[in-house]
Amino acid sequence: MADDLQRKGMELRTQLFGEKAAKAGHEYLRGFDEDFANFLNEQVFGAIWTRPGLPTKTRSFITMAALMALGRGPELKIHMRGALNLGISRDEIKELIIHLSQYSGVPTAVEAIRVLGEVTEPRK
C-alpha cells in the first residue's frame, strides 16, 4: 500500500509541479528527513489529493485559499504555479484572491497579489 501511495503521490506532484520540480521538492525534504518526505508524499499527495470526492482543480483552489489565509507566501507561490499547470487561469486565481480578501483580510490579499505577479510575470 505504501509503495502505491508513493507512486500516486509522485504522479500527482508531477501533474501539479512538473517532473523536475516534483523530484526536486521531494529530494529537498529527503535531505531533511527521508521518513518525513515519504510520509508527506504518501499522505498529502498520494492519499488526500487523489481521493475521489473532489476534482484536482478544486483541491488546488482549496489549497491556495488555505495558504493565502494563513499567509504562507512561499508555499502559495508553489501552489499557484501548480494551479496554472492544471489549467486554472490567472483570472480565476485573481477572483479567488478578491473573494478571500473579505474573509482573510486585505493584507493577505495584497501578499497573494504580489505572489501571483511573481508567478505569472515570466509567463507573459
Label every model-predicted segment:
Residues L96-L100, V115-L116:
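Short acidic/histidine-centered micro-motifs embedded in hydrophobic/aromatic stretches
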Residues G73-E92, V110-R114:
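Extended intrinsically disordered, low-complexity coil regions enriched in Ser, Thr, Gly, Ala
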Residues R59-L67, L96-I97:
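Short, structured motif recognition centered on aromatic/hydrophobic residues
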Residues M1-K57, N85, A109-K124:
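Acidic, glycine/proline-rich low-complexity segments that act as flexible tails and inter-domain linkers
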Residues A66-R72, S104-G105:
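Short alpha-helix boundary/capping elements
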Residues S101-A109:
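C-terminal structural segments of small proteins and small subunits
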